């Protein structure tokens, strides 16, 4: 059985479809088929035989929130999810971070590149990664931590930059927002969730970080 925190978001909905009946879905929003959970507070839910936690819960829209909100949600959420995993003896967490911890620099980045975040979102995600790493380090031979760092995630119901680009092109109103040579690191949402599930199943105990973008 699997738990998904942040299941009502764009990626969370696709992940719950990928996992199917083996997923228990939680979110602060319950418009979708989810149960209520606010990861900013201690998590008090009861399940047995949980194999994997998928932690997608986050504030990510930039700009759009006060700086403090990114840290309150993304850092407290990481702490509370890890504490829940400790209390329930769950040994696998898949955490969705972002390429934002790398900052806005344009040189090619690898998983071992030095993070240099330039936004509160990127900084909060980097701290959240470290919180998850501390959880794994407590029992390094038993616990498995998968950190995925997606670029721009696109797909049906994304309702973001790719959706706006598609609508503009459909109306023959395409234009370059900013520089014409801007590069975007991206991944299709169904490819992302498929990789997340595969890595949770196949990886050995340890910390595994993946930049999940197309090369």
Where are these regions (language model features)?
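Substrate-positioning beta->alpha
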Residues: 158-164, 178-201, 207-208
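Conserved Rossmann-fold NAD(P)-dependent oxidoreductase catalytic core, especially the SDR/UDP-sugar
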Residues: 80-120, 143-146
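Glycine-rich NAD(P)-binding loop of the Rossmann-fold in SDR/ketoreductase-type enzymes
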Residues: 69-80, 115, 119, 123-126, ...
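N-terminal Rossmann NAD(P)H-binding glycine-rich loop of SDR-like oxidoreductase domains
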Residues: 1-21
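Flexible, glycine-rich beta-alpha linker
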Residues: 102-103, 143-163
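Active-site Tyr-X1-5-Lys
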Residues: 116-146
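Adenosine-cofactor binding site in Rossmann-like domains, unifying the SAM/SAH pocket
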Residues: 23-44
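NAD(P)H-binding glycine-rich loop region in Rossmannoid oxidoreductase-like domains
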Residues: 39-76, 80, 84-87, 102
